[in-house]
C-alpha cells in the first residue's frame, strides 16, 4: 500500500546516487527496496528522458519520483574533431562552467578521458588545467554523464566514421582535476559505471590517475576495483617540488611507499606516468634512478613526450633521448611504453585541457 509522502522542497538528481543509495531513496519514499534497483535499471538507458517512460513503475510512484527528483543529461556538447580521430567534448554545466572530455578511438577500443573537477588545485607547472585554478568538484552525475554523452555520440556516429567499436570500452580519470581530491564523488561514479544496471563497465577497464594524494590512495584501492595510475614525472624531490607542488605535502619516498602497500589484485600493476621534459627529467642518470626507486612495486611505465602548450616554458626531448631513457628501464626488466600523443591539433592531448573561457582570463 502506498504511504503518504511529504514532497521534498528541493529535488535531487538521481544520477548522483549509487544503486544502494537509490534503494535508500526508494525506501524513504515508502517503497520496497527493489524499486531502487528498478530505477537504476532505467536511469542509464539512452532513450529514457522522463519518469513516464519507466513503465514497470506504478503511475503513482512515477508521479512521486517526479515531485521529489529528476535525472540529468548532457545535451548539445561542443564537439571538436582532431585529424587523428580524437574527439573533444565541451560540456556546459548547470552553473555555466565548462568541462572537457576526450574520446580516444583505436581499432579495438574507445578510451574516454573524463574530468573530475572544474579546474584543478594542484598547480602542476607543465599542465594547462593547473593554470586554471580550482573552481569546484564535479558531482557523480556530472562525472557519469560524460560517459553517457560519449556513449550516445558513438551510437549515433555513422559506421564509416567509426575507428573503433560503437561504444565506450575504457574510462580513464585523467581529464581536468585531481580525482583523489574528489574521492567521495569519484567512488560513487565508479560504482555507477561498474554496476550492471548502470553502465556495466568492468573495473579492469577503468583507471584513476593521481598526482600523489597519499592520504586517499588506500581507500581507493579498498573500495574500487579499478586500475591506479601515478603521475610521477621526476625521480628526486627537488625536481618534483618544482614541477608538482603536491610533492611538498607528500614527498616522493612517501608516495612510493604508499604504492608498495597499495591494495590491488594479484595480476594488477600500477601505471607510472612520466612526462619527458627536455633537460629537466630526461637524462640517463634519472632513468637509472627511476629503475632503482620503483623496485618491489608491480608496475609498468608510460613515457609521455611533452605536449607543448602556449605560455609554458617546457620542451619535449627528441625521440632519440626518449628511446635511450626507455632502453635503460627495459634493461632493468620494466615494461615501458612511449605514449603516442593524440588530439594535439584540438588541444586535447595530455596536459592541454583548459576551457577557452578560463584561458582567456588567465
Curated annotation (Swiss-Prot):
Entry-linked InterPro entries: Aldolase_TIM (IPR013785), Methyltransferase_A (IPR040072), RlmN_N (IPR048641), RNA_MTrfase_RlmN (IPR027492), rRNA_lsu_MTrfase_RlmN/Cfr (IPR004383), rSAM (IPR007197)
A Pfam family annotated for this UniProt entry: Radical_SAM
Disulfide-bond pairs as recorded: 113-350
GO cellular component: cytoplasm
Catalyzed chemical reaction(s): adenosine(2503) in 23S rRNA + 2 reduced [2Fe-2S]-[ferredoxin] + 2 S-adenosyl-L-methionine = 2-methyladenosine(2503) in 23S rRNA + 5'-deoxyadenosine + L-methionine + 2 oxidized [2Fe-2S]-[ferredoxin] + S-adenosyl-L-homocysteine; adenosine(37) in tRNA + 2 reduced [2Fe-2S]-[ferredoxin] + 2 S-adenosyl-L-methionine = 2-methyladenosine(37) in tRNA + 5'-deoxyadenosine + L-methionine + 2 oxidized [2Fe-2S]-[ferredoxin] + S-adenosyl-L-homocysteine
Protein keywords: 4Fe-4S, Cytoplasm, Disulfide bond, Iron, Iron-sulfur, Metal-binding, Methyltransferase, rRNA processing, S-adenosyl-L-methionine, Transferase, tRNA processing
Residue numbers binding S-adenosyl-L-methionine: 177-178, 209, 231-233, 307
Gene Ontology biological process terms, A to Z: rRNA base methylation; tRNA methylation
Cofactor note: Binds 1 [4Fe-4S] cluster. The cluster is coordinated with 3 cysteines and an exchangeable S-adenosyl-L-methionine.
Active-site annotation: 100, 350
One function term, GO molecular function aspect: tRNA (adenine(37)-C2)-methyltransferase activity
EC numbers, comma separated: 2.1.1.192
CDD domains: Radical_SAM
UniProt key word Iron: yes
Cellular location(s): Cytoplasm
Enzyme class: transferase
Cofactors, names only: [4Fe-4S] cluster
Residue ranges occupied by any Radical SAM core domain in the UniProt entry: 106-345
PROSITE patterns for the chain: RADICAL_SAM (PS51918)
Family stated for the protein in its record: Belongs to the radical SAM superfamily. RlmN family.
Additional record remark: Reaction proceeds by a ping-pong mechanism involving intermediate methylation of a conserved cysteine residue.
Functional summary from the UniProt entry: Specifically methylates position 2 of adenine 2503 in 23S rRNA and position 2 of adenine 37 in tRNAs. m2A2503 modification seems to play a crucial role in the proofreading step occurring at the peptidyl transferase center and thus would serve to optimize ribosomal fidelity.
Protein's name in the database: Dual-specificity RNA methyltransferase RlmN
Organism: Desulfotalea psychrophila (strain LSv54 / DSM 12343)
Phylogenetic lineage: Bacteria, Pseudomonadati, Thermodesulfobacteriota, Desulfobulbia, Desulfobulbales
Amino acid at each position: 500500500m502506498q504511504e503518504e509522502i511529504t514532497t521534498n522542497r528541493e529535488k535531487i538528481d538521481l544520477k548522483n546516487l549509487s544503486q544502494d543509495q537509490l534503494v535508500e531513496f526508494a525506501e524513504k519514499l515508502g517503497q520496497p527496496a527493489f524499486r531502487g534497483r528498478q530505477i537504476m535499471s532505467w536511469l542509464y538507458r539512452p532513450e529514457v528522458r522522463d519518469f513516464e517512460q519507466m513503465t514497470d513503475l506504478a503511475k503513482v510512484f512515477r508521479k512521486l519520483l517526479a515531485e521529489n527528483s529528476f535525472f540529468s543529461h548532457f545535451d548539445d556538447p561542443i564537439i571538436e574533431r582532431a585529424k587523428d580521430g580524437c574527439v573533444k567534448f565541451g560540456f556546459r554545466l548547470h552553473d555555466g562552467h565548462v568541462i572537457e572530455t576526450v574520446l580516444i578511438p583505436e581499432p579495438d577500443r574507445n578510451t574516454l578521458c573524463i574530468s573530475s573537477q572544474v579546474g584543478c588545485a594542484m598547480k602542476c607547472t607543465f599542465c594547462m588545467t593547473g593554470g586554471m585554478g580550482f573552481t569546484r568538484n564535479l558531482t557523480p552525475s556530472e562525472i557519469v554523464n560524460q560517459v553517457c554523452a560519449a556513449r550516445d555520440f558513438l551510437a549515433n556516429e555513422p559506421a564509416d566514421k567509426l575507428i573503433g567499436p560503437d561504444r565506450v570500452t575504457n574510462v580513464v580519470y585523467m581529464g581536468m582535476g585531481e580525482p583523489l581530491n574528489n574521492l567521495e564523488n569519484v567512488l560513487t561514479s565508479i560504482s555507477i559505471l561498474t554496476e550492471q544496471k548502470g553502465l556495466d563497465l568492468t573495473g579492469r577497464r577503468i583507471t584513476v590517475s593521481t598526482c600523489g594524494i597519499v592520504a586517499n590512495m588506500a581507500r581507493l584501492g579498498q573500495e574500487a576495483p579499478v586500475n591506479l595510475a601515478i603521475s610521477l614525472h621526476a625521480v628526486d624531490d627537488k625536481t618534483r617540488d618544482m614541477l608538482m607542488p603536491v610533492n611538498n605535502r607528500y614527498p616522493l619516498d612517501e608516495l612510493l611507499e604508499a604504492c608498495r602497500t597499495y591494495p590491488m589484485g594479484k595480476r594488477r600493476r600500477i601505471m607510472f606516468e612520466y612526462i619527458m621534459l627536455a633537460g629537466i627529467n630526461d637524462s640517463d642518470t634519472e632513468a637509472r634512478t627511476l629503475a632503482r626507486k620503483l623496485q618491489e612495486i608491480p608496475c609498468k611505465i608510460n613515457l609521455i613526450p611533452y605536449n607543448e602548450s602556449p605560455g609554458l616554458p617546457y620542451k619535449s626531448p627528441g625521440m632519440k633521448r626518449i628511446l635511450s631513457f626507455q632502453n635503460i628501464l627495459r634493461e632493468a626488466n620494466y615494461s615501458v611504453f612511449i605514449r603516442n600523443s593524440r588530439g594535439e591539433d584540438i588541444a586535447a592531448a595530455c596536459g592541454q585541457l583548459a576551457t577557452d573561457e578560463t584561458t582567456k582570463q588567465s
